[in-house]
Amino acid sequence: MSTVDKMLIKGIRSFDPENKNVVTFFRPLTLIVGANGAGKTTIIECLKVSCTGELPPNARSGHSFIHDPKVAGETETKAQIKLRFKTAAGKDVVCIRSFQLTQKASKMEYKAIESVLQTINPHTGEKVCLSYRCADMDREIPALMGVSKAILENVIFVHQDESNWPLQDPSTLKKKFDDIFSATRYTKALEVIKKLHKDQAQEIKTFKLKLENLQTLKDAAYKLRESIAQDQERTESSKVQMLELETSVQKVDAEVHNKEMMLKDLRKLQDQVSIKTAERSTLFKEQQRQYAALPEENEDTIEELKEWKSKFEERLALLGTKIRKMEREMVDTETTISSLHNAKTNYMLEISKLQTEAEAHMLLKNERDSTIQNIFFHYNLGNVPSTPFSTEVVLNLTNRIKSRLGELEMDLLDKKKSNETALSTAWDCYMDANDRWKSIEAQKRAKDEIKMGISKRIEEKEIERDSFEFEISTVDVKQTDEREKQVQVELERKTKQNSERGFESKIEQKQHEIYSLEHKIKTLNRERDVMAGDAEDRVKLSLKKTEQENLKKKHKKIIDECKDRIRGVLKGRLPPEKDMKREIVQALRSIEREYDDLSLKSREAEKEVNMLQMKIQEVNNSLFKHNKDTESRKRYIESKLQALKQESVTIDAYPKLLESAKDKRDDRKREYNMANGMRQMFEPFEKRARQEHSCPCCERSFTADEEASFIKKQRVKASSTGEHLKALAVESSNADSVFQQLDKLRAVFEEYSKLTTEIIPLAEKTLQEHTEELGQKSEALDDVLGISAQIKADKDSIEALVQPLENADRIFQEIVSYQKQIEDLEYKLDFRGLGVKTMEEIQSELSSLQSSKDKLHGELEKLRDDQIYMERDISCLQARWHAVREEKAKAANLLRDVTKAEEDLERLAEEKSQLDLDVKYLTEALGPLSKEKEQLLSDYNDMKIRRNQEYEELAEKKRNYQQEVEALLKASYKINEYHDLKKGERLDDIQEKQRLSDSQLQSCEARKNELAGELNRNKDLMRNQDQLRRNIEDNLNYRTTKAKVEELTREIESLEEQILNIGGIAAVEAEIVKILRERERLLSELNRCRGTVSVYESSISKNRVELKQAQYKDIDKRHFDQLIQLKTTEMANKDLDRYYNALDKALMRFHTMKMEEINKIIRELWQQTYRGQDMDYIRIHSDSEGAGTRSYSYKVLMQTGDTELEMRGRCSAGQKVLASLIIRLALAETFCLNCGILALDEPTTNLDGPNSESLAGALLRIMEDRKGQENFQLIVITHDERFAQMIGQRQHAEKYYRVAKDDMQHSIIEAQEIFD
């Protein structure tokens, strides 16, 4: 059920575009009070715009609806309405509409900039936003609220300017009611159905013609398909013959192919003989050439020559290696010489740079010392020692200078604080005097404003008093008293007359007499009917007794057949016949419950057994898988170990083998490292002996022979160590490879160990537990199944009794029914036998009683009419008496108002004179205070100028001193930086490095000359070996060519032998010609068959092409679809006719029912609310505008006595307002089933006091009636405080809202406590 919860307004009409105003809507009442023009109606307008998107009347396309930019002082204003409501399904939704009004050069532009719906996703709890176009939003919100847009516009949220629409012109009234009833939509639906029915009738005729045409085409297509089928059969027969011929041709082709392949092989062999003969001829010539070019032929074999060449190559390789090693050493020496030359150049450049920096450092130290002396002299900081200063002296003097700078900064800070303190004190004195002057000035202005307000109030009170005196002058109090007495006497007389006539007792007496006569008439009618039906009842009695006896025999037979089984079920007891079925059914239900319980237990036990079996199966599978994995890992590890050890090894030996391989690897690595260290030691020894000509260990000088011997010994050691190092490297690599292979098996071995020690034992234990539990569960299941089978047998035996006993019980009930009918008939016949009147006497008595009854009815109607007229007179007199009393009370109130106005005038005059005295005293006190304030401000400004000058002088002195100190510190920093970087020590180091580079350069030049001589000797030796190598290579080439010639000779002889074995080429060619003739004959026969098939296929193709024409395409489906379409269209057309009639009748019935319901509510509300005597009630009259359509015209009628008049143009403004309100309440009651919201804007406009009170009472009764309805919401907007107090009671709302305007003339909404 939809309700509105809260609304935010910003920038609409007079509401501030910068601030948000929020209204919370209560249930059942939301009361909004405020003066005219405060902005109350804007709330209704915002509700209507949010829900329907329709702007209020006279909004000038939205220009006057949005806050004016000129008023806000901006070029554009933005507005927003945010409404939170519950949908008809109870879901919270927030509707947001945003607007913009822009001031252009010559006009204003209105724009709706955003329409958004927000809701909460019930699954995720997240906020979901959907943006809509305005038109979509206008359709979406009424659908969510469960009411139409017309109801929202014309019933729920009605603007004050449109609230009297029920009494507007007939066309407007018709449009409103048509929208509310959705009449136009349904009338159009009827017209569409009627038109569709007519169109479909025409389509049915067309469909029948199409179906006849399709039937003709279908028959033609059938004939074509029949012809195609016959041709296809003939084609298939010919194709079988063609297949046989093709098989024969293929066999002949295969034979031809074999012969051709044989011929091809012969020709290939012939070609190979020719190629190899040519190749042998070429190689033989090459052999002869090589033999002629040999300087001498070597008698050694090819293997001996190759071995000689291999060793020769090895010796040449060693010599080449030595030459390359010496060349590399030569290049290294030249590179070293170049590097030393470069380093020497760099050292010279850096020495020059560092010497320059040392000179600059000395100048900077002298400058620093001079600066320290100047500072101490100028600022009188004490005596200084003589220059140059040591580092410690400089540090002490610098610290004294810094300390003096800190003292100057503290002096400056103290000066600033003392200045601020003095200025603050002077300013406080000034502000104190200024505050006293402002306070008195403010008091004076306030007194002046109060005095002006009092003057204005005096004028208003005088006007009010004059108006009251004028009203009193028009009232004749004496005449009012006399009229009150007359009306009261007449009312008492009528009331007494009403009570004396005793209408209620007389009406009750007449009704009692009528009831008595009706009872007598019914008794006589029964006697007459009984008398007429006597003979028939006796025949019925006899038949009933006969049927009853037959039923008793059937019943006894069934009971005798089932008696023993019943006793067995009920443990030997046989219940009465009437309770037999009930007890058997109870026993059946009991045993069924027991059986169901056992079935449930058996299913649960079976489920547990199945679960255990599945678990056991799963554990078995897992155990099998683990054992399989264990075995595979074991085989894998043992195979790897066997491959490594070349012997059979079990998996248990793996840890020891891994540890052993690790130790062996570490030992080999340690030996290799030790040998490598020795080799690295021998090479520097040899190098140092060459360079320094002394022993590297004892540093003893060598002679030339000792040095040569030492170097030779070192080379021998290095050579032997190198070979040993290679062997150790191979052994270390092998040991590491074995360890790596074993280590890769570690993860597999760990998995194997985990499987054998943890996983498999745990699985076996689980399997054993599940097996034991399965045995227990299986025994329990067998027990339950045994008991269940026994119970099922008992249940089946009882179920076999149910059907016979149901028949017996049904027969027994029929026997009882017949017995009751027999007793009734016997009683009727016995009663009649006591003595009866004749038919004529009964008829005469009935006529007499009927005439008496009609006479009493007439008297009763007359009494009721007299009572109504009397009560109407009393009601009119009461209304006149109340009106006179109100007039009298009004006059008394006017007198009190005049007295009160005069008292207020006297009090205001006294207040005004007192204010004049206060203003005079305050004006006199302002003069001295103004002079004191100006003097204090002048003193403050003088002090501020003087103290600022003193502070600036001290600050300037401190700045000069700080600049000199910073210059000193900068110089000290550069000096310290020179020492920190140790540039003096670096100069000494680089000079030492330059001397060392010169010595190394001389050594390198000597070694370069030595290497050049030795390299030239080795290259000469290398050139002499080349000639010997060429001789060996030429002998090898000659021997190789000779061997190839002999090989080719053997291959040619072999090929010629193969050609002779196969046969001659001419014989094979003759056989191929014979086979080709047979192939031609078969192909001729095959072509003849193909021609026949082509003729048949041409016919088939022609027929198929004809079938593919558009007229035959999908002809069966089209014929079937057309038939279905025809039948379904005929059925649909009949349904449309039914729908048209049903909808037509439903619309008429719905309209009539709703109008009766609306008029009933209008009549009740009018009689409860209206206090005038000129109208009994009002109603809405609807007329059908034509016989053929369901269009209605509407008008509001008023009933005055027996006269019915149209209300429009004959009612006052107040009656119009009240009638419109009541009609809206009735429409809301009738149509707003899903939306219990109703907004009333100024409902008391043009209503007098009694009608306002009665309207308030009616609204209170409606709220009381709807207190159980959760979604009922009444929103009332009024300026009438009295009316608001009448309906604003605490049981209906805790707070009410007051709308007012602030100082900026912006509307504001304030929540206040409800009226007490």
Swiss-Prot record:
Citing just one GO molecular function, the answer is: ATP binding
Gene3D superfamilies tied to this protein: P-loop containing nucleotide triphosphate hydrolases (3.40.50.300)
Free-text tissue specificity from the UniProt record: Widely expressed, predominantly in meristematic and reproductive tissues.
Identify the EC number(s). Answer: 3.6.-.-
Q: Which reaction does it catalyse?
A: ATP + H2O = ADP + phosphate + H(+)
Q: Which PROSITE patterns match?
A: ZN_HOOK (PS51131)
Q: Which parts of the sequence belong to the Zinc-hook domain?
A: 648-747
Q: Which InterPro entries match?
A: P-loop_NTPase (IPR027417), Rad50/SbcC_AAA (IPR038729), Rad50_eukaryotes (IPR004584), Zn_hook_RAD50 (IPR013134)
Q: Which GO terms describe its cellular component?
A: chromosome; cytoplasm; Mre11 complex; nucleus
- Spell out the NCBIfam families in the cross-references: rad50
Record protein name field? DNA repair protein RAD50
Gene behind the chain: RAD50
